[in-house]
Amino acid sequence: MSEKNLKQTVEERALALLEPIVAGEGLELVDLEFLREREGWVLRLFIDKPGGRVGLDECTQVSRAVDPSLDVEDFIPHEYNLEVSSPGVDRPLRKPTHFERVKGQQVKVKTFGPVGEPPRKNFTGTLTEVAGDGISVEVEGAGTFHILFKDIAKANLEFQF
């Protein structure tokens, strides 16, 4: 299995396994990533607290809650470190509800393939609309682009200095 396929498989299985566990702790699993870093493999979870901030206590709580299930399921073929953190200022946007929360703010969106006219894959601008099938992003000097959720490869809140 290629590293890319391994990464995707682990992320999909981990998301399906861990999302309900994190929800059971009263928190939200915003995103996760499985990647190889200099020190080895890392499974990194990004959690959020509805209506509040995530602190060290919540990260520890989630780590302790998910660790036994990861050990029992044992689907990760490499030794890895588990990291749990808040999504940070450039929080990932994965679900329609994530986009709803940041409507009117600056976002950065990458698509799987070219979208819009003129066609492009990278969009940085104001999130102006969240509809049933996608979002609209107003890019300064280029207009407003409608992007379907299925076409979004990656999206983040863009921190404003």
UniProtKB/Swiss-Prot annotation:
Principal localisation: cytoplasm
Domain of life from the UniProt record: Bacteria
Listed GO CC annotations: cytosol
Coiled-coil region(s): none
Classification via InterPro entries: Ribosome_maturation_RimP (IPR003728), RimP_C (IPR028998), RimP_C_sf (IPR036847), RimP_N (IPR028989), RimP_N_sf (IPR035956)
Signal peptide (from-to): none
SUPFAM superfamilies registered for this protein in UniProt: YhbC-like, C-terminal domain, YhbC-like, N-terminal domain
A single BP term in Gene Ontology: ribosomal small subunit assembly
Protein localization: Cytoplasm
Record keywords: Cytoplasm, Ribosome biogenesis
Gene3D superfamilies found in the cross-reference section: Ribosome maturation factor RimP, C-terminal domain, RimP-like superfamily, N-terminal
Pfam families in UniProt: DUF150_C, RimP_N
PANTHER family for the chain: RIBOSOME MATURATION FACTOR RIMP
Protein role: Required for maturation of 30S ribosomal subunits.
Family listed: Belongs to the RimP family.
Designated name of the protein: Ribosome maturation factor RimP
Lineage of producing organism: Bacteria, Pseudomonadati, Myxococcota, Myxococcia, Myxococcales
Originating gene: rimP
